[in-house]
Amino acid sequence: MTQQTFLVEIGTEELPPKALRSLAESFAANFTAELNNANLPYGEVIWYAAPRRLALKVTNLSATQADREVEKRGPAIAQAFDAEGKPSKAAEGWARGCGITVDQAERLVTDKGEWLLYRAHVKGQSAQLLLAGMVNTALSKLPIPKLMRWGDKDTQFVRPVHTVTMLLGSEVIPGTVLGIDSDRIIRGHRFMGEPEFTLDNADQYPQVLQERGKVIADYELRKAIIKRDAELAAQKIGGVADLSESLLEEVASLVEWPVVLTAKFEEKFLAVPAEALVYTMKGDQKYFPVYDTAGNLLPNFIFVANIESKDPQQIISGNEKVVRPRLADAEFFFKTDRKKRLEDNLPRLETVLFQQQLGTLRDKTDRIQALAGWVAAQIGADVNHATRAGLLSKCDLMTNMVFEFTDTQGVMGMHYARHDGEAEDVAVALNEQYQPRFAGDDLPSNPVACALAIADKMDTLAGIFGIGQHPKGDKDPFALRRAALGVLRIIVEKNLPLDLQTLTEEAVRLYGSKLTNTKVVDEVIEFMLGRFRAWYQDEGHSVDTIQAVLARRPTRPADFDARVKAVTYFRTLDAAAALAAANKRVSNILAKSTDKLNDHVRASVLKEPAELKLATHLVVLRDKLEPVFAAGQYQEALVELAALRETVDEFFESVMVMDEDDAVRVNRLTLLSKLRELFLQVADISLLQ
């Protein structure tokens, strides 16, 4: 069977840079699925992506599908014919679907009966006949939120398409893809190399495109070149480039032929907070900032051109001219904002709505101020500093700098607070109030910042849930999932003595009569416990371990963490599986029983040695573990409880729980309930699988 290389390249207008990788990866995944569905053997599917093209190369693709034997079992003979031996409607319908008549069907005989059988040898189709359709299907399933039309055609795609190249070996695969007939023509760089040329065979790609068209189609190669050359460029000026992964990805998606260049700006701009300068360079211009070895911003930046120029200095000068006005704006805003104190912006917060039913940002500030003070008192932070941070928390939103450079919120509050002489932990709290912003982000670094961050997030959670605007599906406009996880991470990882019940109640209380949802406290807590579940699953804890702990509905996050870790450790013990099974058995027995249990086990009613032994063991453990439970030492408690295994096994082997004697039965059920209560001090281990 002949094997060849297949190439498809879709030549387009500039594709969305932030979506380029996902488009290419999805194209490859979709086409791979099509190959598998079509039963076309292949070697490897390799994707390529550049600003004006998506391409796939499939190695060792079979020229035809493999022949296959098809078998379709029909109705049983008893249902296939009536009493007179005539085919039933079911048999005729089945035969028609197979393209035969009933009398052409074979018989399948097994020890379970006899059925009609269709058997055929299906010859594999040529790959040439299948590939165009498979490409169309793969493209139609790309994750494109908004499609566009172009020209006078009804065809829709993420961007206008100009060329479609499909080659199997050296042969053009005929077909129409996205309204374009396939050919062997590909286009090169807009300004370098050959603007258009033909491919002789699929194996030439992408090397010939790089040599003749001055386009590096290999996404990872472009990214590696940019990273390598930017690091070298920074070293030449004694610095280190800020090569964040997200910006590297975006820049690699913007250029077909990366050329790394170094530029500079006036040193006077370094008086402006570095965050504002970096925001301009990275966010607006897609430049890489450069720092010295001490982490201070240098008056240089590295950028990537999409062309090899005979006069690179001209490109450098052009970029320096572009960025200078933006830096000058930042300098002006910074100087202007500092002409008044941060606190002077408070009245302007009354003009900005937080949410229609929940009031203005000034209303939110007042609530945050009170809640931050309350949280600070609970965790031993400076209450005065926490309330001060709460009062100033949203003031920087009214500054010129944050209005123009929105991503600098928080950090500009810190700089302005320092300028005003505020306490350092207050200033830092203003910067860190939004942390953690994403999974893996840093947590607030001091107790005042923790109090402010928790207060800000809990106020939003209480308010939005309080008016019934819960997150639905993928829609979460107020980022409540992120807020909930942020609160939990701060409490757990900082080991703060906070209870979600009282914390939520306090956040709700501060809204007064604004909230309409009477179940807001319970709903916020359930939502946060749900985020706990997702977080700990991501951390590698099993679902049933988390469920076992959640069954106790622990509302202190640090306590939840300790319980989950204790149960996870317990599962490594030899006795764990047997005790989990025993707890499940106990749970089922108690659930089915209609007897009213005693308050305590009556020693006088105990008859069997095994139940006496269990009762004695439970009394000893209960007294021993009371201070252990109180201290939250759940792992130690479960290790002690694991010693019950032998005693519990003996009990179930030799004692009839559901005795005919009412007093004996109720006493034994009470004994089992006391056993279960001990384990429930940690978790419901009957839920462990």
UniProtKB/Swiss-Prot annotation:
Gene Ontology CC: one annotated term: cytosol
SUPFAM superfamilies assigned: HD-domain/PDEase-like (SSF109604)
PROSITE patterns: AA_TRNA_LIGASE_II_GLYAB
EC identifiers of the protein: 6.1.1.14
Catalytically driven reaction(s): tRNA(Gly) + glycine + ATP = glycyl-tRNA(Gly) + AMP + diphosphate
Entry keyword Aminoacyl-tRNA synthetase: yes
Any one GO molecular function term: glycine-tRNA ligase activity
Keywords, comma-separated and alphabetical: Aminoacyl-tRNA synthetase, ATP-binding, Cytoplasm, Ligase, Nucleotide-binding, Protein biosynthesis
GO biological process terms on file: arginyl-tRNA aminoacylation; glycyl-tRNA aminoacylation
Top class in the EC scheme: ligase
Cellular localization per UniProt: Cytoplasm
Record InterPro entries: DALR_anticod-bd, Gly-tRNA-synth_bsu, Gly-tRNA-synth_heterodimer
HAMAP family: Gly_tRNA_synth_beta
Family of this protein: Belongs to the class-II aminoacyl-tRNA synthetase family.
Subunit relationships: Tetramer of two alpha and two beta subunits.
Cited NCBIfam families: glyS
Descriptive protein name: Glycine--tRNA ligase beta subunit
Gene source species: Yersinia enterocolitica serotype O:8 / biotype 1B (strain NCTC 13174 / 8081)
